[in-house]
């Protein structure tokens, strides 16, 4: 089972992703949900996850900085950005982080399905190559 965290400062987004999306279909366990990047990184400093689903603009630490720090600690972590911002500086930041996807709010679950399927494929491929 893959382990994932969700990080978004909007309670409705956190609730929607946790309660209404079918993570179990992809054998993904959401182990924690956070409202800001700094608190999420405190968790990541001690706990490995396979997938980071994060907003970009948040208090205390933005999603790009969170992703950079997470990638420094776990180079194989997969990242999906979810944001209401269409500014190219955020898109470039996501590209630099080699994110699996950048999904605009409000989240279309078909788009999220495609991104999550890519994550599962990438992790399975990595695990097969290690064997």
Identify what each model region corresponds to.
Residues 7-8, 34, 52:
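Conserved sequence signature across two-component system core domains
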Residues 38-130:
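CheY-like receiver
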Residues 2-13, 17-18:
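Conserved acidic segment of CheY-like receiver
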Residues 31-38:
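Conserved Asp/Asn-Gly motif in the active-site loop of CheY-like receiver
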């Amino acid at each position: 089972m893959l382990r994932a965290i969700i990080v978004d400062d909007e309670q409705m987004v956190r609730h929607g992703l946790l309660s209404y999306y079918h993570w179990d279909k992809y054998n993904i366990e959401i182990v924690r949900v956070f409202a800001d990047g700094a608190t999420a990184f405190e968790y990541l400093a001690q706990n490995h996850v396979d997938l980071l689903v994060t907003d970009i603009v948040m208090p205390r630490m933005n999603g790009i900085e969170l992703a950079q720090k997470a990638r420094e600690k776990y180079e194989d972590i997969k990242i999906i950005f979810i944001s209401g911002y269409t500014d190219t500086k955020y898109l470039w930041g996501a590209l630099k982080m080699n994110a699996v996807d950048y999904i605009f709010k409000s989240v279309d679950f078909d788009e999220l399905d495609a991104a999550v399927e890519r994550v599962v494929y990438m992790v399975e491929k990595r695990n097969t190559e290690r064997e």
